[in-house]
């Protein structure tokens, strides 16, 4: 039985009422990943200073994700695991307040989505803010990261899979990850090899549930 089928009931019944500091904030369709599945490696970069801002943006290192998107991620994870790999998550749900901080630090539409109150007709929308997007990489079963085109949050053109030499290990690993994620229903960013968004389910509203 796949992890997706095994965890289906847990995902559907997961409690979305979180801590008292957020009791007035709408948590939407979010679930806490560790309440559902402990087979992912969670390393939220924005809960540390090891990110492009150089500052800790999230108060908590808990990973939240839209419940329907999680079903897709588990489906992809099962394929990766069968092939001998694990999924490491660098980011998932992101509060609106955090997106505002990112825009203040790096206001470039090519790499950072505008916060909702600054969106234009042509700007792209980040589904991190409703929990339907994940930034990931792959590791071996011991947790060692596979070689990829760049580090996380690298804003150079080489972060796009297409800008890499198809003969390299980095390209092959990123292309493989992309293929599996797309088969599970995700869309892939054309500029960031690590960035995948839910391309299957309706997109709910943005949330500002603080983490």
Q: PLM features: what roles do these ranges have?
A:
Residues 98:
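Short, well-ordered surface patches within globular domains
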């Amino acid at each position: 039985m796949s992890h997706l089928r095994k965890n289906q009931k847990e995902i559907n019944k997961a409690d979305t009422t979180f801590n008292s500091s957020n009791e007035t904030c709408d948590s939407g369709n979010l679930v806490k990943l560790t309440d559902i599945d402990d087979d992912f490696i969670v390393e939220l970069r924005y809960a540390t200073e090891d990110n492009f801002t150089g500052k800790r943006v999230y108060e908590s290192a808990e990973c939240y994700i839209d419940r329907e998107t999680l079903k897709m991620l588990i489906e992809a994870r099962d394929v990766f695991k069968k092939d001998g790999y694990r999924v490491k998550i660098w980011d998932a749900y992101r509060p609106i307040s955090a997106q505002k901080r990112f825009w203040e630090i790096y206001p470039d539409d090519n790499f950072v989505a505008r916060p909702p109150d600054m969106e234009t007709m042509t700007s792209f929308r980040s589904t991190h803010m409703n929990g339907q997007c994940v930034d990931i990489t792959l590791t071996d079963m011991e947790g060692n990261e596979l070689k990829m085109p760049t580090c996380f949050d690298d804003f150079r053109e080489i972060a796009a899979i297409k800008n890499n030499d198809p003969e390299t290990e980095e390209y092959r690993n990123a292309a493989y990850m992309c293929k599996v994620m797309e088969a599970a229903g995700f869309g892939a960013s054309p500029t960031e090899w690590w960035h995948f968004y839910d391309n299957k389910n309706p997109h709910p509203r943005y949330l500002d549930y603080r983490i």
